[in-house]
Amino acid sequence: MCIRDRDIFSLSQESLWLITVVYDLGLALLLYRFFGKYGLYVAVVLGIVLGNLQGGKVSELIIFGSAYKVSMGAILYSGIYFSTDLLNEKYGKTEANRAVNLGFFANIAVLLTLLLSLLFKPSDLTGSALEVHNALSVIASYSPAFIIGSLTAYFISQKFDVWFFNYLKTLTQGKYLWLRNNLSTIISQLIDTFIYTFTWVIATDLSIYDAFYIALSKYIFKIFIALIDTVFIYGVRNLNPLVKNDE
């Protein structure tokens, strides 16, 4: 029996949110297990690219009777912190920073490629060609201020996360993984959310009040994700990748 689209979307949005978080973190874990640090590089690139592509997909979740506006991109983007923290924990600060740099340049490359593709006129052979062209136009038509702000938020917050995680690890002599994982991520996400929200106000007609409301909702869920990924990072802490010569 086929499940209609409306039946799928009538499922609990809160359950779908949790499933997506577990899927995102689980994917990063599998990439690490089979490909080592290179798999985590891929996880970071996927997180930043897919997170930005789906940043405009906003849903409403009801938690304890309160409504929260949550971006789909925020879920995928938050998973990046799990990957960089795992890289930092297993391979060191240099490898974590390399993953951040790869994600930054990959995001620019995807954006430039989308812009180049829009220079080609869609064929009139089928109606779908125009539909795809218009869809790509929507994705690639963010204002320069929004793009610059998004990249800036990513780069600054991720660099801080890598540095602070390593600093806490040194300070605690390698103890209290839960502390450095959560504290570095929560503070870094606050930096990212602040820069991103400031960009929204500049690049759109969104009021400061609405921007703050959305930012607060996103930040609360980012904290939830940080708490969830603590379980994953402890689960994989003593797990070695299947590939050899992974150092």
Sequence positions of predicted segments:
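Conserved small/polar residues in nucleotide/adenosyl-binding loops
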Residues: M1-D5
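Structural signature of hydrophobic alpha-helical transmembrane segments
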Residues: D7-T20, A67-G79
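N-terminal signal-anchor/start-transfer transmembrane helix
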Residues: L18-R33, D161
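A generic, lipid-embedded transmembrane alpha helix
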Residues: A43-E60, G73-Y81, V110-L115
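Transmembrane alpha-helix/helix-exit interface in multi-pass inner-membrane proteins
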Residues: N101, F105-G127, Y154, Q158
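Membrane-interface interhelical connector segments
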Residues: S117-A145
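Membrane-embedded alpha-helical bundles of multi-pass transporters/translocases
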Residues: S137-A145, G149-S157, Y167-T172, R180, ...
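Internal alpha-helical transmembrane segments of multi-pass membrane proteins
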Residues: L171-L190
